[in-house]
């Protein structure tokens, strides 16, 4: 339901939410009238706050208390009232550039460092999903002989992450030179067939193009590649999470039971969390925000999740988000997530 507000109502709603974000205390009309230069009387502020309460944008936690924003109030605030703070974006980009030597590190290490930095800057929990190996394009395949019958299959993905598995050859080759030639032929064949494809495209391999003398290996290779594909198809989304201890510093999480439920979700039920941080396919690069009850999981309904995706080229490969109380400084957090997502996209895409 769209709520039409006058300019004055927007001013007072914005001031009330800003005050509550800063203090974590219910906001009295007197505080708005005296601390914000709105050029209105205390009576006008009081009456306007009452109207905002009747509209469902504010509420009183106790009869004698001031007012606090509802989830609907925060939604209006985020969609219509805030102005993102550009300085935090510049600071984040500068720190990301200074702190990390991207190409010299594995992607998971980079993501962990980025998550830690965002938690430090925001004071909240940072969530980053790792790229799904099943959907990533294969850059290079290498077959390496360990002995006459064991071969290590190494996949290098387009993000430069590596995956590996062992294959036991039924008919090993004792001659080292012949074994090396055989593996080189098989390696060249697989690279020609699979470079630029993903593991979900194994059916595209034309095994008839493999030289006849090496056809004896085709069934074993097919079985191994199917095994790799099945392994990753059953893997849940892997998360990098940082800042869990920061949760305890927020007054909203003073109840032990509430914290335990949220920690259980973050640590043990990540398969349920993954759909919430997946961006809208219609606007994958935009920052998206789930406020309070907009989160479908009960432990997160006292939280806001601000998230976006990072890409390899134009293709989303993972998500990055900041999770905190609904009383978060949105004007700082939104540009922080946007900057981090853009920077991860830049670094992942240039790992060629």
UniProtKB/Swiss-Prot annotation:
Belongs to the HrcA family. NCBIfam families: hrcA. One of its GO terms (biological process) is negative regulation of DNA-templated transcription. It comes from the Bacteria. InterPro entries: GAF-like_dom_sf (IPR029016), HrcA (IPR002571), HrcA_C (IPR021153), WH-like_DNA-bd_sf (IPR036388), WH_DNA-bd_sf (IPR036390), WHTH_HrcA_DNA-bd (IPR005104), WHTH_transcript_rep_HrcA_IDD (IPR023120). Negative regulator of class I heat shock genes (grpE-dnaK-dnaJ and groELS operons). Prevents heat-shock induction of these operons. It comes from Thermosynechococcus vestitus (strain NIES-2133 / IAM M-273 / BP-1). Gene3D superfamilies: 3.30.450.40, Heat-inducible transcription repressor hrca homolog, domain 3 (3.30.390.60), Winged helix-like DNA-binding domain superfamily/Winged helix DNA-binding domain (1.10.10.10). Pfam families: HrcA, HrcA_DNA-bdg. Keywords: Repressor, Stress response, Transcription, Transcription regulation. The keyword Repressor applies. SUPFAM superfamilies: GAF domain-like, Winged helix' DNA-binding domain. One of its GO terms (molecular function) is DNA binding. Signal peptide: none annotated. This is Heat-inducible transcription repressor HrcA.
């Amino acid at each position: 339901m769209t709520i039409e507000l006058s300019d004055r109502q927007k001013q007072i709603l914005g001031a009330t939410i800003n005050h509550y974000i800063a203090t974590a205390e219910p906001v009295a009309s007197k505080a708005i009238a005296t601390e914000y230069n709105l050029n209105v009387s205390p009576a006008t502020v009081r009456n306007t706050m009452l109207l905002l309460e009747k509209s469902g944008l504010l509420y009183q936690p106790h009869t004698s208390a001031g007012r606090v924003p509802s989830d609907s109030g925060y939604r209006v605030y985020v969609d219509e009232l805030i102005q993102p703070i550009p300085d935090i974006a510049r600071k984040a980009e500068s720190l990301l550039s200074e702190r990390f030597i991207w190409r010299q590190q594995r992607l998971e290490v980079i993501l962990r460092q980025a998550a830690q930095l965002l938690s430090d800057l925001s004071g909240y929990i940072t969530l980053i999903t790792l790229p799904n190996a099943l959907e990533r394009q294969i850059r290079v395949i290498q077959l390496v002989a360990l002995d006459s019958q064991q071969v290590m299959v190494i996949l290098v993905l387009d993000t430069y992450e590596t995956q590996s598995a062992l294959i036991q050859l039924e008919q090993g080759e004792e001659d080292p030179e012949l074994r090396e030639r055989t593996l080189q032929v098989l390696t060249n064949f697989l690279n020609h067939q699979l470079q630029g494809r993903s593991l979900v495209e194994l059916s595209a391999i034309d095994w008839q193009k493999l030289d006849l003398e090496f056809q004896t290996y085709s069934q074993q290779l097919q079985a191994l590649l199917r095994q790799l594909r099945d392994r990753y198809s059953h893997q849940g989304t892997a998360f990098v999470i940082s800042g869990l201890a920061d949760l305890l510093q927020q007054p909203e999480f003073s109840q032990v039971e509430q914290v335990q439920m949220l920690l259980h979700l973050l640590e043990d039920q990540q398969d349920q969390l993954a759909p919430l941080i997946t961006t809208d396919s219609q606007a994958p690069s935009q920052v998206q925000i789930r406020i309070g009850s907009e989160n479908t999981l009960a432990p997160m309904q006292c939280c806001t999740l601000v998230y976006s995706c990072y890409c390899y080229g134009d293709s989303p490969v993972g998500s990055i988000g900041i999770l905190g109380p609904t009383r978060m400084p949105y004007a700082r957090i939104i540009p922080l997530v946007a900057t981090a997502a853009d920077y991860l996209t830049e670094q992942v895409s240039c790992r060629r």
